[in-house]
Design a protein with these regions (language model features):
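Conserved glycine-rich cofactor-binding loop
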Residues: 19, 26-27
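Conserved glycine-rich Rossmann-like NAD(P)H-binding loop of the short-chain dehydrogenase/reductase
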Residues: 40-57
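Substrate-binding pocket helix/loop in short-chain dehydrogenase/reductase
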Residues: 112-113, 120-125, 151, 219, ...
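Active-site helix of classical SDR
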Residues: 136, 172, 180
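Alpha-helical segment proximal to the catalytic Tyr-Lys
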Residues: 141, 185-189, 197, 258
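Residue(s) in the substrate-gating loop at a strand-loop-helix junction
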Residues: 156
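Short, small/polar-rich loop/turn modules that mediate ligand/substrate recognition or access, typified
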Residues: 188, 192, 200, 205, ...
Length: 273
């Protein structure tokens, strides 16, 4: 059955023979990204933490929805540098290579500044920002050896606007902007030093996508009155759906995006205008 989260027919095959790894890939936006990448022909590995039954269920759903596709799930704590390196190595060992990394994993621990503990701050930064760095660091080493690759960081409109009670989350997501731009510059610099021409082929690019308010489980705890107020502030008048984020990620992962790097792609219904 076709859903808004699945890739449209004209996208099929654009990522054939590519291997992708999506952190936080078994639910919400991450699951939609996995579906879109698989629909475009890629072999997909999805990262998760703790939720074994959900991960196995999603694994089975993916194999049923995309017969003949390669799809694996890998458990790891994104907040641990050692786990990041281990999981990425596991993905490469399993699939033989890595072409595309999507840093999607993220958590929230919401508190006002006065009530936020050291652990509240450090945990969110560790998963949302440090984890993205450690994953990208390990992926870049492999991609530079091969001479090509894609890294796509999933940030948030909250990283641009800030939000009461989310200073840790906003800081982590804003940090991804600087991480993206610096990685993009360094990737091309190192690519040239390694003797790979930066002007030919698909290149090695790093970009970010900044979703607005997307209809996922993460919004499930927000009261209806608050959601109505949020909708009223969005120029297009509605929440986004995960598939709309996934389609942008698919484009940035494709060869056709080779001239785009170090950029922040806002997908938020005009919320930041």
């Amino acid at each position: 059955m076709t859903t808004t989260e699945q890739t449209q027919p004209d996208q099929l095959g654009t990522l054939r023979d590519r291997v992708t790894f999506v952190t936080g890939g078994t639910r919400g936006i991450g699951a939609a990204i996995c579906r879109a990448l698989a629909g475009a022909g890629a072999a997909v590995a999805a990262g998760y933490w703790h939720q074994h039954e959900r991960a196995q269920q999603f694994h089975d759903e993916m194999l049923a929805a995309y017969p003949g596709s390669e799809f694996t799930v890998h458990e790891g704590n994104i907040g641990s540098a050692d786990d990041c390196r281990r999981v990425l190595s596991e993905v490469i060992d399993r699939h033989g290579r890595l072409d595309i990394l999507v840093n999607n994993a993220g958590i929230t621990i919401d508190r006002t500044v006065a009530k936020m503990t050291d652990e509240d701050w450090q945990r969110v930064i560790a998963v949302n920002l440090s984890g993205a760095f450690f994953m990208a660091q390990a992926a870049l080493e492999h991609m530079l050896e091969r001479g090509s690759g894609r890294i796509i960081n999933v940030s948030s409109v909250i990283g641009e606007t800030g939000n009461i009670g989310q200073v840790n989350y906003a800081a982590s997501k804003s940090g991804l902007f600087g991480l993206t731009k610096s990685l993009a510059r360094e990737a091309l610099f190192q690519l040239g030093r390694a003797g790979h021409p930066v002007s030919d082929g698909i290149g090695l690019t790093v970009n970010a996508v900044t979703p607005g308010y997307i209809a996922t489980d993460m919004l499930g705890t927000i009261p209806d009155k608050v959601l109505d107020r949020i909708r009223s502030q969005i120029p297009v008048g509605r929440l986004g759906n995960p598939g709309e984020i996934a389609r942008v990620v698919c484009f940035l992962a494709a060869d056709e995006s080779a001239y785009i790097t170090g950029q922040i792609w806002a997908v938020n219904g005009g919320l930041d205008m």
